[in-house]
C-alpha cells in the first residue's frame, strides 16, 4: 500500500508532465503551422534537419523524464512507488532545460531561420559541463601528481645538502 508521499509525488509528477507537454506543444504547433504549412516553399534542406533535431532532443528529454517518474504497482494493482521526484536537482534539471531551450529556439525560429543555430547552445553547454566536472579536475590532479614527486626530490636534495654542509666541519683532537 502506498504512503501519502508516493501519492503526492505521483500527482505532482503528473502535473509537471502535463506542463511539459503543454510547453512542447506551444513550441511545436506554431512552428509547424507557420514554417511547414504557411511557408512550405522555403522550408527545406537544413531547416528540416534543424526541426527534426529539435524534436528529437525534445522527445529524448521527455522520454528520460517520463522513465524517471515511472510508477511501481504491486500484484494487487496498488501503488507502491510514485517514481522519482521531478523537482529534484541534478540531471532532471538539465532535461527540463533541454525541453525549454528547444521550445524557445522553435519560437525564435518563427522570426528567422538563423535563430535555429542556437541549437548549438545545448552541445556547447554539455561540453562545458563535462570539461568542468570531469576533464578539468582530472587534468589538474594529474598535473599536481606530476609536480609532487619533483617537490619531494627537492626536499631530499635540501636534506642531503644540509648533511654534506654539516660534515665539512672537522673536529680537531
Swiss-Prot record:
It is a multi-pass membrane protein. PANTHER family: TRANSMEMBRANE PROTEIN 208. The keyword Transmembrane applies. It holds the Pfam family TMEM208_SND2. Its main location: endoplasmic reticulum. It comes from the Eukaryota. It comes from Dictyostelium discoideum. This is Transmembrane protein 208 homolog. The gene is tmem208. It is found in: Endoplasmic reticulum membrane. The keyword Transmembrane applies. GO terms for biological process: vacuolar protein processing. Residues 150-173 have a biased composition (Basic and acidic residues). The chain crosses the membrane at residues 17-39, 45-65, 91-111. Residues 142-173 are annotated as: Disordered. Belongs to the TMEM208 family. Keywords: Endoplasmic reticulum, Membrane, Transmembrane, Transmembrane helix.
Amino acid at each position: 500500500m502506498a504512503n501519502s508521499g508516493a501519492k503526492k509525488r505521483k500527482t505532482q509528477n503528473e502535473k509537471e508532465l502535463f506542463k511539459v507537454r503543454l510547453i512542447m506543444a506551444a513550441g511545436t504547433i506554431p512552428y509547424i503551422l507557420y514554417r511547414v504549412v504557411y511557408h512550405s516553399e522555403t522550408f527545406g534542406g537544413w531547416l528540416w534537419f534543424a526541426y527534426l533535431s529539435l524534436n528529437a532532443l525534445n522527445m529524448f528529454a521527455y522520454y528520460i523524464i517520463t522513465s524517471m517518474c515511472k510508477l511501481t504497482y504491486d500484484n494487487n494493482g496498488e501503488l507502491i512507488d510514485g517514481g522519482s521526484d521531478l523537482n529534484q536537482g541534478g540531471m532532471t534539471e538539465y532535461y527540463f532545460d533541454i525541453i525549454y531551450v528547444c521550445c524557445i529556439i522553435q519560437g525564435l525560429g518563427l522570426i528567422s531561420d538563423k535563430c535555429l543555430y542556437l541549437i548549438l547552445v545545448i552541445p556547447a553547454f554539455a561540453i562545458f559541463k563535462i570539461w568542468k566536472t570531469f576533464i578539468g579536475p582530472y587534468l589538474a590532479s594529474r598535473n599536481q601528481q606530476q609536480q609532487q614527486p619533483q617537490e619531494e626530490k627537492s626536499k631530499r636534495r635540501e636534506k642531503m645538502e644540509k648533511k654534506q654542509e654539516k660534515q665539512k666541519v672537522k673536529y680537531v683532537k
